[in-house]
Amino acid sequence: MTVQRKKISLIGAGNIGGTLTHMIALRELGDVVLLDISDGIPQGKALDIAESSPIDGFNVNITGTNRYEDIKNSDAIIITAGIARKPGMSRDDLLQTNAKVMKEVGENIKKYSPNAFVIVVTNPLDAMVSVVHKFSNLPTNMIVGMAGVLDSSRFRYFLASELNISVEDISAFVLGGHGDTMVPLINCASVAGVPLTQIIDMGLITQKKVDEIVERTRNGGKEIVDLLKSGSAYYAPASSAICMLESYLKDKRRILPCAAYLNGEYGVEELFIGVPVIIGKNGIEKILEVKMNDSEQEMFNKSVNSVRELVKSLGS
């Protein structure tokens, strides 16, 4: 019996797109189409990665292209196209430029791959998912934004480093928009099953230090932009998108914080924002409504309003 390999298209061949191509190949998740408007860049990266296959022992086809028709009938698409942040820029400074790119991407997904599961990575994330959704006409369960997985990973890493324990034993997640108003939920964080609030009571970490970690998580992307001086994070964002992709392709039904379309959940209407969802073979299979304390709810509402204003500023 012939097993048909999955077709995964990556739109944008920058640092994240190239890293994603390599990670997908190493995991043999499917054949890859790497698309970019820059002539030679996707072809060169695709060839470079393909030439490592005899060494690493992976069997996937990797195609670099500048033509949208090559994404036809993709099983999944990850969008990283657009300009990246530079020092001094906020994610929102990218809004108008990247919105034009997302419009073109959305229209081509509608034309060539209307049945794909789509993961958007381009910033400002929550607004860009809205633009792609608008122009692709995808069902809301088949389009999602990568933000919460990355923000939660940063939050967990910072907590583990401060506590000097394995990152594997930290469970925590971040809700809301992928920006300064994101909401790391201390209320739901735990260390090897023990609530973080109890860890604070035990004296293993102070509330002040946790508050500093929350703030560092909010500025996690900026910290890397400032260090790199030209470009933004790409290893952890790529890993985050892979985590979501695998849950879809392998029907893992993982609970992951992602920018999903809310239609009444959390009291929010018609907006993409970060919440915990179950991702399986049908895309977003369920949105989980987590109870927040008053201060978390207030922060979440502020985040919702911030994202809504950003989307509104794009106009019709």
From Swiss-Prot:
GO biological process: lactate metabolic process; tricarboxylic acid cycle
Gene3D superfamilies named among the record's database cross-references: Lactate dehydrogenase/glycoside hydrolase, family 4, C-terminal, NAD(P)-binding Rossmann-like Domain
GO molecular function: L-lactate dehydrogenase activity; L-malate dehydrogenase (NAD+) activity
Cross-referenced InterPro entries: L-lactate/malate_DH, Lactate/malate_DH_C, Lactate/malate_DH_N, Lactate_DH/Glyco_Ohase_4_C, Malate_DH_type3, NAD(P)-bd_dom_sf
Keyword Secreted: no
Catalytic site positions: 178 (proton acceptor)
Transmembrane segments: none
Function per UniProt: Catalyzes the reversible oxidation of malate to oxaloacetate.
Taxonomy of the source species: Bacteria, Pseudomonadati, Pseudomonadota, Alphaproteobacteria, Rickettsiales
UniProt entry keywords in alphabetical sequence: NAD, Oxidoreductase, Tricarboxylic acid cycle
Protein's UniProt name: Malate dehydrogenase
Ligand binding (NAD(+)): 12-17, 36, 98, 121-123
HAMAP family: Malate_dehydrog_3 (MF_00487)
Leading EC class: oxidoreductase
Originating organism: Wolbachia sp. subsp. Drosophila simulans (strain wRi)
Annotated residues for binding of substrate: 85, 91, 123, 154
Pfam families reported for this sequence: Ldh_1_C, Ldh_1_N
Family listed: Belongs to the LDH/MDH superfamily. MDH type 3 family.
Keyword Transmembrane in record: no
EC number(s) stated in the UniProt entry for this protein: 1.1.1.37
Catalytic activity: (S)-malate + NAD(+) = oxaloacetate + NADH + H(+)
